[in-house]
């Protein structure tokens, strides 16, 4: 059995998935120019530190990447242990990934080229692209939100600046308001939503004006924070006991100094969902069946929608 985390682009859906599956023996062509299909699953194959793209129509693996064939120096290959998030960015032409061993990386799909990578800490969960092309990551072990200058000539990078945020698991950029959002665990063990401004300094990127904008009374373990399809002012949040929606309608843009809070609605009383997204055809969730991963996706009713072979 193999461990996977999976990011799916299928019928308008985007989601991270953990799955356990046997090997797929279909060969993956490495020397052709690649374009991401409209319906595809982008998987982080934790057993061999790899990323695999699987065509959702044919159920065949059509693209793969790993730090060994990419000639990552041996001393840094351990950074890519247990990929934790993989997602298409820049109009689906690149993959942005994090791995529990510490890696954050940007990979070009067309030719498998590693464009940028760095170490962002002991247990990163998520990364996001900032407006100028720099990258920000969330790392839970030390509770850090870190920025990186993306230099595709040097390729290997390092942290530029870091702010502390306990049990950081997610980062989402709000293009409309020019804020970065992330959740954290605060005193008392409850989850809170924070926002940051980005200073836009391409060569020395910093997050500023850290502000707590929503605090749960009892909820803990904030995990996945992700935009709601079809509702530009809303974000999904999965946590220890339920699934929520934040409504940011009353939050003005970063040019003001207001302290408006979002509203929050409990949507599903479903515990320990690792990832969620929605699209034209409904809702996808990852509900772990073994530790942090599962063999497939379910909908909001718990009905199986997708399952890996094996």
Across the structure, where does each feature detected by a protein language model lie?
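Repeated scaffold domains used in trafficking and secretory/extracellular systems
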Residues: 75-87, 121-130, 165-172, 217-229, ...
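Short loop/turn segments immediately following beta-strands, especially the blade-tip
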Residues: 56-61, 149-154, 196-206, 247-258
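Long, ordered, amphipathic alpha-helical scaffolds
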Residues: 221-310
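Conserved beta-strand positions in repeat-built beta-propeller and related beta-rich domains
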Residues: 42-47, 89, 96-101, 136-141, ...
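Blade-loop segments of beta-propeller domains
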Residues: 65-126
């Amino acid at each position: 059995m193999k461990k996977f985390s999976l990011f799916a682009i299928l019928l308008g859906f985007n989601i991270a998935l953990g799955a356990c599956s046997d090997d797929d023996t279909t060969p993956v062509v490495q020397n052709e120019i690649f374009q991401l299909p409209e319906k595809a699953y982008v998987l982080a194959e934790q057993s061999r530190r790899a990323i695999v793209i699987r065509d959702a129509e044919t159920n065949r693996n059509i693209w793969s990447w790993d730090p060994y064939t990419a000639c990552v120096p041996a001393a840094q290959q351990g950074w890519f242990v247990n990929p934790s998030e993989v997602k298409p960015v820049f109009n689906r032409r690149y993959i942005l990934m994090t791995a529990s061993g510490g890696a954050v990386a940007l990979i070009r799909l067309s030719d498998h080229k590693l464009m940028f990578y760095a170490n962002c800490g002991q247990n990163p969960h998520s990364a996001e692209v900032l407006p100028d092309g720099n990258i920000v990551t969330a790392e839970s072990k030390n509770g850090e939100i870190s920025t990186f200058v993306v230099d595709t000539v040097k390729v290997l990078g390092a942290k530029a600046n870091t702010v502390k945020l306990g049990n950081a698991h997610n980062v989402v950029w709000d293009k409309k308001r020019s804020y970065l959002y992330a959740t954290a665990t605060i005193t008392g063990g409850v989850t809170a939503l924070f926002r940051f401004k980005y200073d836009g300094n391409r060569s020395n990127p910093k997050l500023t004006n850290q502000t707590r904008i929503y605090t749960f009374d009892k909820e803990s373990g904030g995990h996945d924070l992700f935009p709601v399809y079809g509702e530009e002012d809303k974000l999904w949040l999965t946590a220890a006991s339920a699934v929520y929606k934040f409504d940011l309608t009353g939050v003005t843009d970063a040019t003001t100094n207001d302290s408006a809070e979002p509203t929050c609605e409990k949507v599903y009383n479903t515990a320990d969902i690792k990832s969620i997204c929605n699209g034209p055809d409904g809702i996808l969730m990852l509900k772990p069946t073994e530790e942090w991963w599962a063999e497939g996706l379910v909908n909001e009713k718990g009905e199986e929608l997708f399952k890996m072979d094996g």
